[in-house]
Amino acid sequence: MRIVFMGTPGFAEVILRALIENQNNNIEVVGLFTQMDKPFGRKKELKAPETKTYILENHSNIPIFQPQSLKEPEVQILKGLKPDFIVVVAYGKILPKEVLKIAPCINVHASLLPKYRGASPVHEMILNDDTIYGVSAMLMDLELDSGDILGSASFLREGYLNLETLSLKLAHMGATLLLSTLKNFHSITPKPQDHASATFCKKITKADGLVGFKDAKSLFLKSLAFKTWPEIFLENNLKLLGVELVENEKSHREGEILRIDERGVLVGCLKGSVRIARLQAVGKKPLKAKDYLNGRRLKAGDILA
C-alpha cells in the first residue's frame, strides 16, 4: 500500500510517525508533501515543519516536497509516486480536483465533523467547553472539510486540557483511526455529512489572545486554548500565565486584586475569579505574580490592568 502523506505541524507528525512505524509492513510512505520552511522567532530564522524534521532525522530515504502550490508540475510528481492513497493531516492547502483524481484522499481532522470545519478545531473544542472530544477520517472533496465520513473516534472529557495536551491525545487517536480506515477502506461505506449542522472555525491570530476580566471561565478557557500561542494578555500587553479558575459565580469589580500569596494573585471578574501564578510584562521575563505586584506596588483592592 503506497501512501503519499501531506501534513505540516506536530499533530501531523504524530500520525506520520504511526504510519511509518506501525507493524503492518503493507504500508509504505513514498513521499511527504509539507509547507515551506517559515521564519520563526525574533531572529526570523527558518524553521522546518515538524513532519519534515521527523523524516530528515529518521527516514531520509523518503522524498520531501515543499511546493508553494499544487499545480500541474506538482500533480505530475504526485502521479509519478503512484500512491494507492493520499493521506492529508493539517497540510494547510486545499487540494485541487486534479490531485483528488490521483488516488483516494483521506483526511484526518481533529473534530467530530461536521462540527468545527476549518483551521482551529482543537482551539474551538476548548473555547466552547466541550465535554466530548474527537477526530474524524473523511474522504476529501473540493470543499473545506465537507467530504463523506469514513470513521470517527471520541472520548469523554475527564478534566480540563490545554491545547498541547489535547492535540497530542487527539493525534494518537487519529493515528489509530487512520490505520483502521486504511486497513478496512474497501469495506467501509462513506457517510455524507449533515451539512446543515456544520460549524466553522477560523485561523487563530495574535488578537485572539486579548482578554479582560469580565468572565472568569472564558478567560480560563482562553488560557488553555492559547497556551502555546498567542498566549493571553491584557490591553497593556501584560501576559497572564498559569491561570486557574477559582469560581464562576460571584460578582466582583473587573480586575480587582482580591488576594496575593505565594500561589499567585486572585483576581475578580464581573463573573467569577481566577488565580494567576505568573505575570510577564512586554520585553521582560515572567515573574511570580507576587513579585511583579510588589514591584508595581499593587495590593489587594487595587485593579490589575
Swiss-Prot record:
Any single Gene Ontology cellular-component annotation: cytosol
Coiled coil spans: none
A single GO molecular function term of this UniProt record: methionyl-tRNA formyltransferase activity
E.C. no: 2.1.2.9
Keyword Transferase found: yes
Domain of life: Bacteria
Keywords: Protein biosynthesis, Transferase
Residues that span the membrane, as ranges: none
Swiss-Prot/TrEMBL catalytic activity: L-methionyl-tRNA(fMet) + (6R)-10-formyltetrahydrofolate = N-formyl-L-methionyl-tRNA(fMet) + (6S)-5,6,7,8-tetrahydrofolate + H(+)
InterPro entries found in the cross-reference section: Fmt, Formyl_trans_C, Formyl_transf_N, Formyl_transf_N_sf, Formyl_transferase-like_C_sf, Met-tRNA-FMT_C, Met-tRNA-FMT_N
Record bears the keyword Transferase: yes
Leading EC class: transferase
Binding-site residues for (6S)-5,6,7,8-tetrahydrofolate, renumbered to this chain: 111-114
Family as reported in the entry's similarity comment: Belongs to the Fmt family.
Annotated function: Attaches a formyl group to the free amino group of methionyl-tRNA(fMet). The formyl group appears to play a dual role in the initiator identity of N-formylmethionyl-tRNA by promoting its recognition by IF2 and preventing the misappropriation of this tRNA by the elongation apparatus.
Name assigned to this protein: Methionyl-tRNA formyltransferase
Organism: Helicobacter acinonychis (strain Sheeba)
